[in-house]
């Protein structure tokens, strides 16, 4: 009986991971927690007990993309990484770090390029953008920095058809800035040289 229940739970985890991966691949949901919750509802689960973790969902996403998006996703990822390199070169004075799906290789047509930037004065980025005539929107996001919470300015712009999110931290917070999802395999942040290496440059 216990073995059957365990097998059933494993099957449900795999089903939810697959459904979450499909939502991320086909509907552009970027948030793992939201995709997981929506997938659980689709699977008819009333609570969050025994749901897959981010690593399982990421593995399912890679499998889904390999099966159903192999003709398009690699080219989309390459374009986003090329744009990321372009932006990181232009914003080199802010010590940019690439995070998220463009780095881990699961990005697709719906994905943003997400960069962490570092400045003595966060307002200096707004001046930098204005001087280069970028059109952008701005807000703030509450994020955890070490043991504390902070409001981090976020700038949203478009470069070569790709949406770019710039999160601006104080220079002293580089070692505290979020490192993407802690469960994910592989590097969670990358400097310009690392991204260039991914492109074979």
Please name every model-derived segment.
Residues 2-29, 36-109, 120-201:
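Catalytic core of pol beta-like nucleotidyltransferases
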């Amino acid at each position: 009986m216990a073995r059957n229940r365990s097998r059933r739970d494993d099957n449900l985890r795999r089903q939810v991971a697959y459904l979450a991966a499909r939502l991320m691949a086909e509907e552009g949901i970027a948030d793992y927690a939201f995709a997981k919750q929506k997938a659980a509802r689709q699977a008819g689960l009333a609570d969050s007990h025994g749901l897959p973790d981010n690593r399982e969902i990421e593995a399912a996403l890679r499998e889904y993309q390999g099966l159903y998006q192999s003709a398009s996703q690699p080219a989309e990822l390459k374009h986003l990484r090329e744009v990321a390199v372009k932006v990181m070169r232009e914003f080199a004075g802010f010590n940019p770090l690439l995070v998220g799906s463009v780095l881990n290789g699961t990005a697709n047509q719906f994905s943003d390029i997400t960069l962490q930037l570092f400045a003595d004065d966060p307002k200096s980025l707004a001046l930098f953008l204005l001087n280069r005539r970028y059109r952008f929107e701005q807000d703030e996001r509450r994020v955890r920095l070490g043991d504390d919470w902070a409001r981090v300015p976020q700038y949203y712009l478009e470069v070569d058809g790709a949406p770019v999110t710039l999160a601006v931290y104080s220079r002293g917070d580089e070692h505290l800035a979020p490192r993407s999802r802690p469960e994910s395999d592989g590097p969670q942040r990358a400097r310009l040289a690392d991204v260039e290496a991914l492109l074979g440059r």
